[in-house]
């Protein structure tokens, strides 16, 4: 600011602000010039431009800056004119914006606007109706302050209480303000009481003073007033001069009271003068107190006629007052007893204004000119109506807004009465009426016949013409507006089309880029998969070579597949004792598994033989050099090098002679037979005797010489024998659980490390391993006879435990059994291995006798042990995945148990799934609807591998006929593709003749799995079989029927019921369009789901992937459909509910021990599994794994999906206080739709989420009991509330909505 004097001169015109003012703005205000005004206008225009061009999400921010700028830039009185208009614009602009109705910034603008108006209460009532600031404490606080300032403390208190009841925020501030208001109210009441007491005390003091001023006779002492006359001492008169009529100086309340008392005394009657009395000797006359100044008491005595005279007057000395002012004197009397007649007054109304011409006005004015006439016309008084209009026009905007702040706002319902009253007053003022005594009323609407800019009236015809012109103008304007609107709409449409085209182009580009990226990613994934497969194959070959060369596989595996045969062959990987050469050739003729020649064996794999042949080529070249050197020496002894043994099958026994010259060619050497090897190594006979055996015996193959050694030698390395105790203990083994025996055996044995067998891609060969029928019960494991006969189904008791059948040698009618049992039914067998034999020394009779004695002693000990074991009548089982001891009983039956010693299983690993399929392969092969086509490729076109979900195929474009059956199908649509195992599901139609003649549904679902798998087919058949055994026919219909499975080398194809077109539970939820499902209907779906999972757990199956997409809706029948009752399933209710599909991740708990637990990484678990649930069920100290509670989690996810209309997935957190799982996002469930949320739904979800599913051996019964208990809670609630149990009508409505939504999707 320039100087202090400038500030002193202008500070009185500055309006103070609570926030203070900017000194720079004040400096500009001190020096107001034209430039400063122009700068203010420029800044104002900038703000207007910013507000108009703003396109952000918070436009009120610019208005707040604009308002603050006006308050700072206009510090004088003109701020109100600028500010109130700006506030009105801002409040009117955001009136219909919902997000600002409870914004404190917008509410402060309204309060500032109300503060500048003359009646803020009207503004607050408007805010109440519009619900602006409804939940903000500032509204109630400001309204209470207004009422308090007006003295309406009751309304102020109500305003505070109303805000507290509505829980306006911040509630603490509002409560504190209410307490402050109560304190002020109490203080104000105390102050008023004190003030009243002071007034009473002052009044009492005044009364005492007045009494003190009375004399002894009761008269007040006369006090001299200013400019008054002094009465004589002889005359007691109150007459004063006329100057005393004005108020005397120093007038007090005592003088007023005395004056009032005197007036009351003057009301006494007037005594008439009596001449007789006046002529008496005393010459005294009693007069009225008004003239003689007697007191009230004396006047009363005189009126009563008492003889006592207090005041006297001598007429000779003073003229009486009556004679002096006789005409102006009026007797005083009581006005209440007098009726005054008044004249009738005419009702004055606004007269009819007569129109006056200018000529007549000019004639009336004297000495008027034309200019004077014009000036006089302006001074003509206007009518009352025009005065009102004129006065309203002269009002400024500030006054107009202050008087009517809501004039430009929409009217609300609360102001209807006021608006109606105002309109009626306007009508009355706009029309001038003239009334007569006869109550006649003549109306005349003068503004209709007067133009706005002119003062003369118009005729009726002119008025009609003006109305017609207005209508024409309005029509033209409307037409012009329509044309403009059409143009604008066309422009908008064109712009939208251009935008849509651009968006389409961008989307197409993005889709192309996405497709290219997806193709690249697929290619990269395929390359990685190929690399991974190649890497696995290499590792597999390396492991196989290492195991075969160094660590022969355990001889404790049960032989019932081709894989077992290869494992047994691996036992003979090292050269036999008699195959070792003499000292001269022993170093160069060692035989290993990698050098085994490629013999025509049907059990060997082509891929494995190719690798071994390639490896043998280099070794054979090296061995040939050694063989040539040995042959050049012309030694008569037979050379058992590797090359000679490898080429034995290609040598003709008739060619060549023993010890003949071969001319350095090793291929011309004589045929080496099994007999030559035995005689040379064991009995050290010469070459002639070996040649005799060559002539007597046929040539043998490499495998046959091993068999010959096993049969002919007394002390073999490996022995295969039959156990006669198995046949007697077969019945006993059926009654005892297989897993319990394995567990009891594992506890007795000491663990040692044992490696597992390598995996193979195909677990089913083209034919099984069949036993050789014979009378003596002997057999060989090296034969594989083709089985072309039809498979016969096994008996029910044999299907229950396929592993036991394979071990105990139970065979079907064709001799197909577990592990190659003989057709005579002589029992199972065991492979065991003795200790490695020492190297052979030269033959000695003493040593031979010692060996025979030792063998006899060993046989006696073994017989005693066998007798003791027969008395126990139990068979010990050994787990192939577990560990074995160094000493194994040769009569022990060793089986493949899939439960480790610690009882924790990872069921989703590839290795474990391969063992599972091996385990159930015998059961699957016995099913009639299973077709093993393992030697062929799947007859599916490549087009199916490249299709996408929901892709339709042309009619009859893909037709496939399945082998071993007359079924022919037509592929019509690709339904879905699984993200878990990569399987694809298609919709197919049967077009064969059998489907046309039968009444069965021709539509089926075809599931293609790559790599092939039999697990889902096994689970589906086991569910139906076990439910049928338990007579659960109703639940049996809730699971899909699997018609057949075709097992190829590259894929497995499964045909089953088609339920996808009926819709899933996800489709049911989405058909409601975001509206929550009716609570009774949600309870019905929950009851059906719990019942279905309860029966599934009862038969020992864990589904493992319960979700909304795997629950397919059943429309069911409509005939014989009674009302729903709890615990009953009659009529059409049997076909209602859902069908559970996708058993690829299911677990058969009967295969494992009863106390087995399961663990798996989160990548292999179902999608959406919460990490907190996995932590508490796998990594905690109490729960080392999960079991049936995996399905509990699926049930909770499905029901949460229903309760939230599919908006969010289930989110969990671990409570630190209770250590239990809690639902984080339960607040999104609408309590209005689900009234039993706190009493039923949330306890139900938390109970299942925190249940671990284990209770020792009673696990299955415990899980079913928990599900049944929760199901009974919902059934009891619906049964106790019959109004809410009208499920039938609700289900009909849901069926219609789902049918319409599914039809629209198709």
Swiss-Prot record:
Residue numbers spanned by region Disordered = 229-262, 363-439, 528-558, 579-670, 747-875
- Please list the residue ranges that the record marks as compositionally biased, kind Basic and acidic residues: 837-859
Residue intervals of the Protein kinase domain: 953-1298
Q: Name one GO cellular component term.
A: nucleus
Query: Which residue ranges have biased composition labelled Acidic residues?
Result: 860-869
Q: Where is the composition biased (Gly residues)?
A: 815-828
UniProt xrefs under SMART domains: Mad3_BUB1_I
Recorded hits in Gene3D superfamilies, A to Z, give:
1.25.40.430, Transferase(Phosphotransferase) domain 1
Listed name of the protein: Probable inactive serine/threonine-protein kinase bub1
Which gene does this sequence derive from? Answer: bub1
């Amino acid at each position: 600011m320039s100087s202090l004097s400038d500030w002193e001169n202008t500070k009185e015109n500055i309006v103070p602000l609570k926030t203070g003012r900017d000194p720079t703005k004040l400096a500009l205000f001190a020096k107001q010039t034209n430039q400063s005004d122009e700068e203010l206008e420029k800044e104002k225009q900038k703000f207007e431009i910013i507000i108009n061009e703003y396109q952000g999400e918070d436009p009120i921010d610019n208005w707040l800056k604009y308002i603050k700028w006006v308050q700072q830039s206009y510090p004088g009185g003109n701020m109100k004119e600028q500010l109130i208009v700006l506030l009105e614009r801002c409040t009117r602009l955001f009136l219909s914006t919902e997000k600002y109705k409870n914004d404190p910034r917008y509410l402060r603008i309204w309060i500032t606007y109300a503060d500048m108006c003359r009646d803020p209460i009207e503004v607050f009532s408007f805010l109440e109706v519009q619900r602006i600031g409804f939940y903000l404490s500032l509204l109630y606080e400001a309204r209470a302050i207004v009422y308090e300032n007006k003295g309406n403390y009751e309304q102020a208190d109500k305003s505070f209480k109303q805000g507290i009841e509505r829980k306006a925020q911040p509630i603490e501030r509002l409560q504190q303000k209410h307490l402050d208001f109560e304190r002020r109210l109490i203080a104000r009441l105390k102050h008023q009481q004190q003030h009243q007491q002071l007034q009473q005390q002052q009044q009492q003091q005044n009364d005492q003073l007045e009494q003190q001023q009375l004399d002894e006779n009761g008269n007040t002492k006369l006090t001299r007033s200013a400019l008054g006359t002094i009465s004589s001492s002889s005359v007691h008169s109150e007459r004063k001069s006329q100057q005393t009529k004005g108020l005397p100086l120093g007038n007090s309340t005592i003088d007023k009271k005395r004056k009032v008392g005197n007036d009351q005394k003057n009301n006494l009657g007037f005594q008439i003068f009596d001449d007789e009395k006046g002529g008496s000797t005393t010459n005294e006359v009693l007069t009225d107190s008004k003239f003689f100044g007697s007191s009230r008491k004396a006047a009363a005595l005189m009126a009563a006629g008492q003889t006592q005279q207090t005041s006297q007057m001598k007429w000779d000395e003073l003229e009486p007052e009556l004679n002096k002012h006789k005409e102006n004197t009026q007797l005083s009397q009581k006005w209440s007893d007098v009726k005054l007649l008044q004249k009738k007054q005419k009702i004055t109304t606004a007269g009819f204004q007569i129109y006056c011409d200018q000529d007549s006005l000019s004639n009336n004015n004297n000495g008027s000119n034309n200019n004077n006439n014009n000036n006089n016309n302006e001074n003509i008084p206007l009518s009352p109506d025009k005065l009102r209009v004129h006065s309203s026009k002269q009002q400024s905007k500030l006054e107009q807004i202050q008087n009517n702040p809501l004039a430009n706002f929409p009217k609300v319902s609360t102001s209807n009465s006021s608006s109606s009253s105002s309109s009626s007053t306007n009508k009355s003022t706009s029309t001038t009426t003239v009334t007569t005594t006869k109550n006649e009323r003549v109306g005349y609407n003068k503004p209709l016949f007067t133009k706005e800019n002119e003062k003369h009236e118009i005729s009726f015809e002119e008025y009609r013409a003006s109305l017609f012109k207005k209508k024409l103008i309005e029509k033209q304007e409307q037409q012009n507006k329509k044309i403009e609107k059409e143009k604008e709409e066309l422009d908008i449409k064109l712009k939208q089309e251009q935008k849509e085209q651009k968006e389409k182009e961008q989307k197409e580009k993005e889709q192309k880029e996405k497709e290219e990226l997806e193709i690249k990613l697929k290619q990269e994934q395929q390359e990685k998969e190929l690399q991974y497969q190649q890497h696995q194959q290499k590792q597999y070959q390396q492991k196989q070579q290492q195991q075969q060369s160094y660590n022969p596989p355990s001889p404790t595996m049960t032989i019932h597949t081709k894989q077992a045969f290869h494992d047994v062959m691996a036992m003979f990987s090292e050269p036999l004792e008699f195959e070792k050469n003499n000292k001269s050739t022993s170093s160069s003729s060692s035989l290993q598994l990698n050098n085994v020649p490629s013999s025509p064996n049907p059990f060997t794999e082509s891929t494995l033989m190719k690798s071994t042949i390639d490896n043998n080529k280099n070794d054979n070249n090296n061995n040939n050099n050694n063989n040539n050197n040995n042959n050049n020496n012309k030694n008569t002894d037979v050379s058992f090098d590797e090359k000679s043994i490898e080429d034995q099958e290609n040598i003709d026994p008739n060619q060549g002679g023993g010890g003949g010259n071969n001319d350095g060619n090793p291929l011309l050497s004589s045929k080496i037979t099994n007999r030559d090897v035995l005689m040379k190594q064991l009995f050290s006979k010469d070459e002639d005797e070996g040649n005799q055996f060559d002539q007597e015996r046929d040539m043998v193959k490499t495998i046959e010489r091993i068999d010959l050694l096993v049969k002919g030698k007394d002390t073999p390395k490996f022995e295969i024998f039959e156990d006669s105790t198995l046949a007697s203990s077969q019945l006993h083994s059926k009654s005892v659980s297989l897993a319990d025996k394995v567990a009891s055996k594992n506890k007795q044995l000491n663990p040692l490390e044992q490696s597992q067998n390598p995996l193979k891609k195909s677990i089913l060969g083209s034919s099984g391993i069949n036993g050789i029928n014979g009378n003596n019960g002997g057999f060989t494991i090296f034969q594989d006879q083709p089985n072309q006969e039809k498979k016969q189904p096994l008996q029910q008791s044999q299907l229950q435990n396929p592993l036991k059948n394979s071990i105990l040698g139970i065979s079907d009618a064709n001799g197909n059994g577990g592990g190659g049992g003989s057709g005579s039914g002589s029992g199972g067998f065991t492979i065991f291995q003795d200790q490695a034999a020492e190297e052979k020394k030269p033959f000695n009779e003493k040593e031979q006798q010692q060996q025979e004695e030792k063998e006899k002693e060993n046989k006696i000990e073994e017989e005693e042990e066998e007798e003791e074991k027969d008395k126990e009548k139990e068979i010990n089982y050994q787990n192939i995945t577990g560990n074995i001891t160094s000493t194994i009983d040769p009569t022990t039956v060793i089986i493949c148990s899939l439960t480790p010693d610690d009882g924790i299983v990872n069921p989703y690993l590839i290795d474990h799934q391969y063992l599972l399929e091996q385990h159930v392969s015998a059961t699957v092969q016995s099913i009639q609807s299973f077709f093993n086509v393992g030697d062929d490729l799947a007859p599916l076109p490549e087009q199916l591998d490249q299709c996408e979900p929901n892709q339709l195929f042309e009619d009859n474009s893909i037709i496939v006929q399945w082998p071993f059956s007359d079924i022919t199908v037509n592929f019509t649509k690709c339904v879905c593709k699984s993200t878990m195992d990569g399987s694809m599901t298609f919709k197919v139609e049967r077009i064969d003749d059998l489907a046309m003649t039968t009444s069965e549904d021709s539509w089926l679902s075809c599931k293609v799995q790559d790599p092939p798998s039999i697990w889902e087919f096994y689970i589906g058949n086991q569910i139906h079989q076990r439910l049928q055994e338990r007579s659960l026919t109703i639940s049996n219909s809730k699971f899909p029927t699997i018609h057949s499975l075709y097992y190829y080398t590259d894929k497995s194809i499964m045909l089953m019921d088609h339920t996808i077109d009926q819709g899933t539970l996800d489709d049911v939820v989405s058909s409601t369009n975001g509206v929550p499902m009716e609570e009774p209907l949600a309870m019905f779906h929950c009851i059906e789901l719990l019942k279905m999972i309860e029966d599934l757990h009862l038969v020992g199956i864990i589904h493992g992937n319960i979700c909304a997409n795997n629950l397919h809706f059943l429309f069911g029948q409509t005939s014989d459909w009674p009302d729903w009752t709890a615990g009953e399933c009659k009529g059409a209710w049997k076909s209602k509910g859902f069908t559970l599909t996708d058993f690829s991740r299911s677990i058969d708990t009967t295969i494992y021990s009863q106390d087995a637990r399961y663990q798996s990484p989160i990548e292999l678990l179902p999608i959406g599994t919460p990490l907190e649930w996995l932590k508490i069920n796998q990594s905690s100290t109490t729960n080392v794994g999960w079991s049936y509670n995996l399905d509990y989690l699926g049930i909770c996810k499905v029901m949460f999906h229903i309760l939230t209309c599919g908006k969010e997935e289930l989110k969990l957190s671990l409570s630190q206080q209770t250590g239990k799982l809690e639902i984080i996002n339960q607040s999104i469930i609408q309590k209005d739709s689900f009234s039993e949320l706190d009493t039923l739904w949330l306890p139900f979800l938390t109970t299942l989420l925190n249940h671990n599913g284990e209770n020792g051996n009673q696990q299955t019964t415990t899980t079913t009991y928990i599900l049944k208990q929760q199901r009974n809670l919902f059934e009891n609630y619906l049964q106790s509330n019959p109004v809410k149990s009208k499920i039938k009508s609700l289900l009909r409505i849901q069926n219609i909505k789902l049918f319409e939504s599914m039809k629209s999707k198709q």
